[in-house]
Structure formats: C-alpha cells, structure tokens
C-alpha cells in the first residue's frame, strides 16, 4: 500500500496519541509536493513511524484522520464504518415505527471527520464538509445503500457542489418523514442544510 506521506513535527505525536481526529497544518513538518486536497495520505512521526491515515487538505485542518491502523481506504472501509454507525443507531431504535429520520453519520463521532449523512425514510442526504469526503462521495453513497436497508437513494447536498444531485437512485426533492409519531414535510434539495 503506497500512499503519499505527511510527516509530523517533533513532539506533535502526543496529540495523536490521544486519538484527536484532526492534524493542524502547524503540526506538519514535511508534506510531499503536489498533494491534492482530499488525497488519502499516511501520517508518520518525525522518526518515520506510521501513526494514521487521513484525508489531506491545504487548509488549517491539514489531515482528518480516517484510521489509526494501516489499511486500504476502499469500498470495504466505507461499508465497515457505515455498518458500525448503523449498528449504533439500531441500539437507539432508529429507525423505528414512530421515527424514520435520523443522523446516520455525525462526522468525527462516527470516525468519518468531515461527513454528515441524514436518513429521511428511503432517502439519505450526503453532506461533505471536507474535500476528501467530497472526493469519496460516490463510494460512500454506494456503501450507504448496501448497509442501510431502507435507503434506496442518496442525494448530495454538499456546500461545495454546484447543485444537489443524486449519487445513487433518484426521487422527488421532498418527502414526508416521521419523528416521534409526528409527520413533517422535508425538502432535501432546497431545505436548510440536509433538509430538515
């Protein structure tokens, strides 16, 4: 597995030892030239030891950590992370007979920094807040419909996309959801944030 490497400045490993999912640009001493925003990189200590894998960005938050272990960031990775999030929501009885709208992915809390995914019945709304997640949109959308049985369509509502578009499936721009037995009309194409 050969990926570009970014190197931490001496002494900056401590923060990552506490599993903080962000690496700020000031913590890096060396970045391989010509890295694209959103590219998957390995993070190494100043001694050359592997620490993490993440999405690189030429912004203040230079790396958003995806994994603390050496592994491929591929379809099985996205399925695994989404499956873990789905399993956690299932323990909270989501979805249920009185609620079919919930947040499936809440960024760093679900070990997917820079990503929000809300489920509204059979539609999932994808919202990337980091270039790496936007670059991975199609793979993530495909993994969503594979791991969340009720979802048949995924729409992209990321801030950095020109217009909302369907990543998987298609549908109307709005629908009715249930939250604690109450019905709400949600417009996931023009509504605020992800629609609700």
Regions found by a protein language model. Give the residues of each.
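Non-catalytic accessory regions of SAM-dependent methyltransferases
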Residues: 1-121, 171-174
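Short clusters of small/polar residues that mark proteolytic maturation junctions
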Residues: 45, 55, 129, 188-189
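Short, surface-exposed beta-strand-loop junctions and turns on beta-sheet-rich folds
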Residues: 49, 58, 132-134, 192-193
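Short amphipathic alpha-helical segments
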Residues: 74-81, 132-140
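Non-catalytic substrate-recognition/targeting regions of SAM-dependent transferases
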Residues: 105-118, 134-196
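A short interface-forming secondary-structure element
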Residues: 121-134
């Amino acid at each position: 597995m050969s990926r570009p490497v970014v190197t931490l400045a001496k002494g900056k490993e401590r923060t990552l030892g506490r599993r903080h999912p962000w690496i700020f640009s000031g913590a890096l001493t060396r970045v391989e030239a010509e890295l694209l925003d959103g590219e998957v990189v390995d993070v190494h200590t100043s001694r050359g030891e592997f620490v993490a894998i993440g999405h690189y960005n030429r912004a203040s938050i230079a790396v958003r950590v995806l994994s603390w272990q050496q592994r491929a960031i591929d379809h099985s990775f996205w399925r695994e992370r989404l499956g873990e999030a789905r399993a956690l929501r299932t323990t909270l009885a989501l979805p249920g007979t009185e609620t079919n709208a919930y947040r499936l992915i809440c960024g760093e809390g679900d070990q997917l920094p820079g990503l929000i995914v809300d489920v509204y019945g059979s539609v999932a709304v994808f919202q990337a807040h980091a270039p790496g997640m936007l670059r991975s949109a199609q793979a993530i959308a495909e993994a969503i419909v594979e791991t969340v049985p009720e979802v048949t369509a995924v729409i992209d509502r990321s801030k950095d996309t020109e217009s909302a578009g369907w990543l998987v499936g298609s549908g109307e721009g709005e629908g009715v959801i249930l939250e604690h037995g109450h019905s709400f009309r949600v417009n996931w194409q023009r509504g605020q944030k992800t629609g609700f």
